[in-house]
Amino acid sequence: MKFSIMGDSISTYEGYNPFLYDVFYTEERAIQAGLRSVNDTWWMKVINSFGGELCMNDSYSGSYVAGATSASAHSVERVSKLKSEESLPDIVLVCMGANDCGGGITLHGEDADDEYAFDTTYGIMLDRIKAMLPEAKIYCATVMLTDDEASGKYKFRLDYIEKYNEIIRQVTKDHGCALIEMFDKHIGYTTIDGLHPDRAGHQAIADMIIAGMKRSMLSD
């Protein structure tokens, strides 16, 4: 089973993302976060738990779903990186939305092609993934809270996150994809700066995604 990841900085790791992508978890930051190897990242923990292998990690630090740039998750350029030259993924994990929330991206577009609104671009992203990878199972994760003790410049308001999560839930349902519910007022992940998970934080994210995927598989 081959996995591809559509993510932002939380899902990056030096040496595992496409050439010229911005990466948050450089060797120095990985050490700061307590990540001993790529196997301590949330996404590799998920892949390993299902006995799978990585196809592509299409994660770009600082990227939004919305926006008219090649780094935007809904762009043709980003979506095209979900497959490799040799293979296609069986599963695509979409873990996007934190930067849109933090950046205050407009929630609802004026029309279906609005590249600057979260709801329209999340839908465009899923349309393009499904068109390119019609056989892949697509899982979309809502934005998870950080631990109550987390602090730093990236701390988000709970009520604000939920506005974006509501869009993720609805658009995921409308496009026939599987939802992984990550939002729980009583569960958060630990960080190094208020947003980016440390080793324990990566484990917490992985646990939520693994549980969500298993629930979805049982209901299929």
Each PLM stretch: what is its role?
Residues D8-S9, A98:
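Active-site metal-binding loops of divalent metal-dependent hydrolases
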Residues I10-S11, G201:
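Short active-site segment of divalent metal-dependent hydrolases/proteases
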